[in-house]
């Protein structure tokens, strides 16, 4: 497997053939679902996971970072929470609680291989609760 050699090189990553998009399985008390993520860039030591507001908002207002993060070679992840834009839409309001959303973010973090040595969380509104 080839290792990425530059900021925009997706070689050797499980999202190499999807332009950075990855659907991540999420396990909840109401069933199993998938949430949408998209990685931009390649930087093993500087990553940001973007947490949007809501419930029900989308990643789209974070797209402004496309004008800033690449210049600093920061790897970043868009993520639509369950019931948002490209993620599954169970339309079950019992899933809209802080504890469940925290668990969802933890499942996303683990699946993406993010840990305290390489990631920062950036949340707005509901995303920073």
Segments from the language model and where they lie:
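Gly/Ala-rich beta-loop-alpha elbow adjacent to hydrolase catalytic centers
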Residues: 123-127
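A short loop-to-beta-strand scaffold at the N-terminal edge of the catalytic core in hydrolase folds
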Residues: 30-40
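Conserved alpha/beta-hydrolase
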Residues: 69-88
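Conserved acidic catalytic loop of the alpha/beta-hydrolase fold
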Residues: 99-119
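Catalytic nucleophile-loop/oxyanion-hole region of alpha/beta-hydrolase
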Residues: 88-102
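The serine-hydrolase catalytic nucleophile loop
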Residues: 55-67
């Amino acid at each position: 497997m080839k290792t990425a050699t530059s900021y925009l090189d997706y070689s050797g990553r499980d999202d190499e053939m999807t332009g950075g998009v990855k659907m991540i399985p999420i396990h909840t008390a109401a069933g199993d679902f998938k949430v949408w993520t998209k990685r931009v860039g390649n930087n093993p030591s500087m990553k940001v996971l973007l947490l949007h507001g809501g419930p029900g908002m989308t990643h789209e207002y974070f797209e402004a970072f496309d004008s800033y993060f690449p210049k600093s070679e920061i790897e970043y992840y868009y993520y639509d929470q369950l019931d948002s834009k490209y993620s599954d839409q169970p339309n079950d309001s019992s899933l809209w609680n802080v504890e469940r959303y925290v668990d969802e973010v933890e499942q996303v973090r683990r699946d993406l291989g993010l840990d305290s040595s390489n990631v920062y969380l950036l949340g707005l509104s509901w995303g920073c609760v």
